[in-house]
Amino acid sequence: MKTNIEATRENHQTPSTTSKRAGAPRVANLGAPDLTQRPPRSPRSRLGGYALLPRMLDKGRATLAGTNGEYHFNCPVDQHILSFIGIEPEKLLAELKKGKGDGEILEWIQANAKHKHEPWETQQWSDYMDRRGPDSDAETLQFFAEYVAKLSKTREDIKTWADVLELDDFVSFGGKA
């Protein structure tokens, strides 16, 4: 007996979702998001307790697929988590190229990270990254204020880099700030 999901999947096959093999459904490549159509996951999303990691994995997979749009793998935000974990971006990209899922990548990171952390350390770091705002130097504060102003003239609640990234993602895909 087929489950409801299997029946639904079978009833909604189209030529673009079926394999060249007769009767075999083709699975969409959900591992490589199209970041020209939607943003990567939130910087607040967690994988293994790590903030930023799911977002960076989305950008890495999209980069490999050529669907990264305006998003850049190994940008300064990504470099924060790469530094904390102690993983070289090229090696992570090579693992993503193998088609590994999030869980497999997390296992690889845990096995290969130069910097091993206790769960409480990872949680504190991730909480800090969620709350991290611009540094107090005038140049950074000005950049932050101008960047937020380009996105919205009315949003006074945008205080952290995570806030800015989420707002930018929202506005970039048609949202009203």
Show which residues each predicted segment covers.
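Short hydrophobic targeting helices and cationic amphipathic motifs
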Residues: 12-13
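Long, low-complexity intrinsically disordered regions enriched in Ser/Thr, Asp/Glu, Pro/Gly
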Residues: 19-26
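Amphipathic alpha-helical packing elements
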Residues: 68-109
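Amphipathic protein-protein interaction modules
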Residues: 92, 96-152
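Polar/charged low-complexity regulatory segments
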Residues: 28-68, 128-177
